[in-house]
């Protein structure tokens, strides 16, 4: 019946002899759209309006049906509606506050839809009037601040955050949203922090608060001084920072859990049984169903916290009691085009008060572990632009972490060992690793595992050059810390070396295809210089002398790849062309690797001949290596332990502008979809005293 009434409210004429009855609120909306002052016929018009249940659909559709010129004629009444909405936010009766918040959402969205370049009106003038805009927005922001910080209803606080998200995301490009200038002047930063520092409000509103903060931080961040950036960078309150970390961790964990559930469904269901019978022809389709959109909004919030606030780094490694708690959905969360896996906030709408412990290793978990698991999922599939950007953002966050001295200290801390079960891409030539076999190790081992996994699994013709470059840079920065602090990490370095050698082999094998799109020599030089780092400084950070011997063994064993690489870069560096200079740099960087190969290979051949052995074992080769170090001459190479620090503004501005745009569109869709559960709200506030 309620739906019929809504539809009736949208009808202008009826084919029946009698006109259909309209809701009273619809009749009142019609009065607002008649150019006359509605209080002339009813002095209590505005008081009565906010006692009526809001019909968002009708109000928005009414605004949508008008062209710019018609809307301009109604400016005075729209200004009055906006003004009285703000006034109603201070009302004693909470039902009025609820209705005013919902009306503001509909009004802002509806008017913004008409704000096209051809419409000929200014959004601020249409909603508030130029002369009153500053005062109106000041009053609005103060009222929202009071509601968010007060002891009132949690539903009201939720509505306030929805309204703010609506306000921020009405334009795709948030930096073009002129209303946000007033949100900069009348800051709600402290209200957001208060939500994050309080366990109850954080659990109910933390997700919206964190996403709102991430968006506000990205408003004109390169053009002017953004107060939200300044304030976020200096937050040092432990409860607030931990609260923000918990919200992010919970959202990431929820994504990980949903992914794992879907993965298990695919492995245990009928589909899995069918593919086992007929082979692997359907495997790609199954994986495609699992590899769905990441939650970029929460990822952006994590990035801004890590990038802007050095105090937040401590939160990454901190274990919390709440980290072991996960909210149980009352019903399955729908996965829709506007609400992909992981983007549905773990809000109070879908969470029961009951909370259960996570899996067995949760008690030794933290935000960084949750993020690494999350990254291992989203970095698996980078075939489309959206997934590529998600993987890029994960690597940018890891880059910031790898550059931080304190972060490196806890990453390498032998007293902080964790078992991190990263997700691995299904590949035909390798078995699925058993999670229980993963040992407890310092967290940096999981970071390196993630980098190795990416290197091994993304060698394809549509080569993600940018992601590979970032991946190698992260490994390099970790090695620089180990060299500087003489940290001897017990890690399976051979896996990294083999991954890097196979990457070089891939780049050479696909030289023609890749050179048509990329300068492969920048990446090649970075990979070769990683080997140079190990050769030059490995004795200061490799765990044992035998590890250093194994490095030489792998270089000698795979010498054909290095020989082929040298031939390729020598060919291109001696020919005039665009690759002459970059190829020449790689040629020079190979000097020590070639010296090792040219020094040890004859000695290995001689050893085999003297001992009448056709094929030497690994131990025999290592014996030759150990006994001939003293006659090896290597060239000292400068700058191997230096790197350029990450800079967002100079190199990543375009990426973050586009990312903020994508998030704004997605948040707007989600807010529009479940902005306001009116039945729940009206039930809560049905008693008007």
From Swiss-Prot:
Highest taxon of source: Eukaryota
Keyword terms of this UniProt record: Cytoplasm, Golgi apparatus, Membrane, Transmembrane, Transmembrane helix
GO cellular component: cytosol; Golgi membrane
GO process terms (BP): regulation of Golgi organization
Transmembrane regions: 520-538
Pfam (any one): ARMH3_C
Subcellular location: Golgi apparatus membrane; Cytoplasm
Membrane topology: Single-pass membrane protein
Function as written in the Swiss-Prot or TrEMBL entry: May be involved in Golgi maintenance and protein secretion.
Name of the molecule in the record: Armadillo-like helical domain-containing protein 3
Annotated organism of origin: Xenopus laevis
């Amino acid at each position: 019946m309620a739906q019929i009434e809504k539809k009736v409210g949208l009808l202008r004429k009826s084919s029946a002899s009698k006109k259909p009855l309209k809701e009273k609120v619809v009749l009142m909306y019609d009065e607002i759209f008649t150019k006359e002052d509605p209080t002339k016929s009813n002095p209590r018009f505005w008081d009565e309006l906010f006692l009526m249940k809001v019909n968002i659909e009708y109000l928005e559709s009414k605004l949508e049906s008008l062209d710019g010129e018609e809307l301009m004629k109604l400016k005075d009444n729209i200004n009055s509606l906006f003004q009285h909405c703000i006034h109603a936010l201070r009302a004693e009766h909470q039902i009025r506050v609820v209705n005013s918040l919902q009306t503001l959402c509909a009004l802002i969205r509806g008017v913004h839809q008409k704000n096209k370049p051809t419409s000929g009106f200014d959004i601020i003038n249409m909603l508030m009037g130029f002369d009153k805009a500053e005062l109106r927005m000041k009053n609005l922001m103060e009222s929202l601040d009071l509601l968010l910080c007060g002891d009132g209803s949690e539903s009201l606080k939720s509505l306030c955050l929805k309204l703010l998200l609506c306000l921020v995301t009405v334009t795709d490009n948030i930096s073009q949203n002129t209303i946000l200038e007033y949100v900069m002047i009348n800051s709600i930063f402290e209200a957001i922090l208060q939500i994050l520092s309080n366990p109850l409000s954080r659990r109910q509103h933390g997700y919206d608060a964190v996403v709102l903060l991430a968006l506000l931080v990205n408003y004109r961040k390169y053009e002017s001084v953004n107060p939200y950036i300044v304030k976020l960078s200096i937050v040092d309150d432990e409860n607030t920072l931990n609260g923000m970390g918990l919200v992010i961790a919970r959202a990431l964990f929820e994504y990980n859990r949903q992914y794992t559930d879907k993965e298990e469904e695919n492995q245990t269901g009928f589909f899995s049984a069918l593919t086992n019978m007929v082979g692997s022809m359907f495997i790609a389709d199954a994986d495609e169903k699992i590899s769905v959109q990441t939650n970029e909004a929460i990822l952006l919030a994590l990035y801004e916290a890590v990038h802007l606030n050095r105090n937040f780094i401590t939160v990454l490694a901190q274990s919390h009691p709440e980290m072991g708690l996960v909210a149980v959905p009352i019903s399955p969360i729908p996965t829709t085009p506007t609400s992909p896996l992981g983007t549905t906030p773990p809000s109070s709408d879908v969470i029961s008060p009951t909370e259960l412990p996570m899996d067995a290793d949760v008690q030794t978990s933290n935000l960084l572990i949750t993020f690494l698991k999350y990254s291992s999922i989203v970095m698996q599939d980078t075939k489309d632009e959206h997934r590529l950007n998600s993987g890029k953002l994960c690597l940018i966050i890891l880059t910031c972490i790898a550059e931080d001295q304190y972060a490196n200290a806890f990453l390498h801390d032998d007293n902080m060992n964790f078992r991190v079960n990263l997700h691995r891409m299904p590949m035909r030539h390798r078995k699925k690793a058993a999670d229980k076999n993963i040992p407890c190790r310092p967290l940096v081992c999981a970071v390196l595992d993630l980098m190795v996994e990416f290197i091994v699994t993304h060698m394809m013709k549509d080569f993600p050059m940018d992601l590979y470059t970032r991946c190698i840079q992260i490994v390099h920065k970790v090695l620089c810390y180990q060299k500087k602090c003489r940290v001897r990490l017990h890690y399976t370095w051979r896996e990294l070396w083999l991954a890097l050698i196979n990457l070089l082999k891939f780049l050479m094998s696909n030289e023609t295809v890749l050179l048509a799109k990329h300068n492969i020599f920048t990446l090649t030089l970075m990979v070769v210089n990683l080997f140079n780092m190990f050769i030059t400084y490995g004795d200061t950070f490799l765990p044992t002398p035998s590890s250093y011997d194994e490095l030489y063994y792998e270089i000698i064993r795979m010498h054909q790849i290095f020989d082929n690489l040298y031939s390729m870069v020598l060919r291109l560096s001696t020919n005039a062309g665009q690759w002459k200079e970059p190829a020449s740099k790689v040629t020079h960087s190979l000097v020590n690797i070639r010296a090792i190969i040219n020094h040890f290979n004859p000695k290995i051949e001689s050893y085999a001949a003297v001992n009448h052995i056709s094929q030497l074992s690994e131990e025999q080769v290592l014996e030759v290596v150990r006994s001939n170090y003293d006659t090896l001459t290597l060239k000292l190479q400068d700058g191997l332990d230096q790197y350029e620090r990450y800079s967002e503004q100079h190199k990543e501005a375009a990426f973050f502008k586009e990312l903020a745009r994508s998030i704004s569109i997605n948040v707007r869709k989600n807010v529009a979809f479940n902005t306001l559960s009116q039945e729940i709200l009206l039930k809560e506030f049905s008693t008007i005293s």
